[in-house]
Amino acid sequence: METQYDFDDIVNRRNTNCGRWDTMDKKYGTRDMIHLGVADMDFRAPVEIRDSLHKILDMGVLGYTDLSDKFFLSIQRWYKKQYNMDIPREWIVFCPRINIASSICVETYTEKGDGIIMHTPAYGPLQNSILKNNRKMLSSPLKKNGEHYEMDFAQMESMVDEHTKMMILCNPHNPTGRAWTKEELVQVADFCREHDLILFTDEIHGDLMKAGVRHQTALDVTEEMNDRLILASSPTKTFNIPGVIVSYMIIPNEKLRKEIEVT
């Protein structure tokens, strides 16, 4: 029997130092609006998560922590349950936030002035990981095809030169919500292989799919893609816990992992 959760009771988060509702005066000059600018929800987190946090608070000491086996095991179990994939523990790398992960990868795998391909419209903080690290953002606008968007591989080809080193992909795409198919991701894999590009993919919204659509993780496309892949994700969108600072990278290539550890 599946656990049922309450999506009817909306929590009033005003006057709680809420990054969504309590910043409206400063940002927009009014509180009389519905704020849709931040990707969190006004539903309570699952009771299992809240109970676990209560146990820590009831213990009373909020000291330094270390990564336990449970951290790695929870990710391994999730990928097994969702995708029937066995993820080796050593592939998993902790990172506080995906925005930090993307910035670390840009610093690690590229040099100042290098080009990084990213589809637009794009999630601002991922763009900043390129621009604030003094790299060149190679903008590839998505093409509208009927009711959905597509990647324009011909346009991407036209931008590549010897200084192009990486692609940053949102899968599913933010903000359009487009869920990339396996066939499209195979094209991405071929493109990155042909041009020797590192692929960073943000899959934080992968669990939030509309009925009838299944998330295609980049980890389950081709072995060649995995050799140049850094996948970043987090439980924060899935379980509505963005205030809990936790994310992770999955990096199958040992050489790429070691380079990240040095950074």
Language model features by range: what are they?
Residues 2-97, 104:
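N-terminal small-domain helix-loop-helix segment of the aminotransferase-like
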Residues 39-41, 171-175, 237:
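Short glycine-rich anion-binding loops that position phosphate/pyrophosphate groups of nucleotides
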Residues 46, 50, 71-72, 185, ...:
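A general structural signal for well-ordered alpha-helical segments in protein cores
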Residues 52, 222-263:
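Conserved core segment of the aminotransferase class I/II
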Residues 62-190, 207-208, 212-224, 230:
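Conserved core of the PLP fold type I
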Residues 165, 196-198:
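The start of beta-strands in P-loop NTPase/AAA+ ATPase cores
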Residues 171, 199-200:
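Residue-level marker for buried hydrophobic side chains located in beta-strands
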Residues 203:
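Walker B catalytic acidic pair
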